[in-house]
């Protein structure tokens, strides 16, 4: 006898037309939500970090940062549409942070841009390290300029054609099957065949920064 199993609830980003930023205890049971952004980037004290965006309203956001943020901290949130929004941390609780925008945003316009415009770029984090790149039987050492869940930008003094299949190894991460998306002026845009898990990328960024600070 087959037993029906209820599907797990989907943890997706939601949006609201409210002019107020999300509150710590805000629950929107019974309110219709639309899927919006999943991963964003924040700039705090000149440093770029990744975050998860749980909820966005016209007045603010509910995010899960991967760094310590105290109430009153000014920062800039970058959405996957490329829009950057100045804001201030208003509260923190159980790993979630509420931020208030300096000026209200048009949620409908942001949503429309995300659905109808070109596919947005994933937030990229600038790094300074080297990767081992395998192109068939050839192996190269290339400088990494930035990294995202979806790929890396590499500096190369060798010519690698667009579309070439590669294996990219970043120190401390599993080798990633990838392909060259573009090649120009000594730089390569490389796309991973599979997205890096956000938690793995954040842990790697932290470890990389700790090594740089200790050097």
Model-derived features with residue positions:
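Structured alpha-helical
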Residues: 1-215
């Amino acid at each position: 006898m087959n037993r029906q199993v209820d599907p797990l609830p989907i943890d997706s980003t939601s949006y609201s037309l409210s002019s107020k930023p999300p509150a710590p205890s805000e629950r929107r049971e019974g309110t219709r939500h639309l899927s919006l952004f999943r991963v964003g980037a924040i700039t705090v004290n000149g440093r770029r970090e990744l975050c998860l965006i749980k909820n966005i309203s016209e007045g603010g956001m509910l995010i899960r940062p991967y760094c310590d943020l105290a109430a009153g901290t000014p920062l800039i949130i970058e959405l996957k549409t490329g829009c950057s929004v100045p804001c201030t941390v208003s509260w923190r609780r159980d790993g979630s942070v509420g931020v208030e925008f300096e000026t209200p945003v048009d949620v409908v316009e942001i949503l429309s841009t995300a659905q109808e415009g070109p596919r947005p770029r994933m937030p990229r984090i600038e790094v300074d390290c080297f990767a081992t790149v395998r192109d068939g039987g050839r192996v190269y050492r290339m400088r990494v300029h930035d990294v995202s869940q979806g790929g890396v930008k590499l500096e190369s003094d060798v010519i690698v054609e667009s579309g070439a299949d590669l294996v990219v190894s970043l120190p401390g991460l599993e080798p990633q099957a990838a392909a060259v998306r573009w090649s120009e002026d000594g730089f390569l845009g490389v796309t991973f065949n599979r997205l890096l898990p956000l938690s793995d990328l954040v842990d790697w960024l932290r470890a990389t920064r700790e090594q740089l600070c200790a050097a």
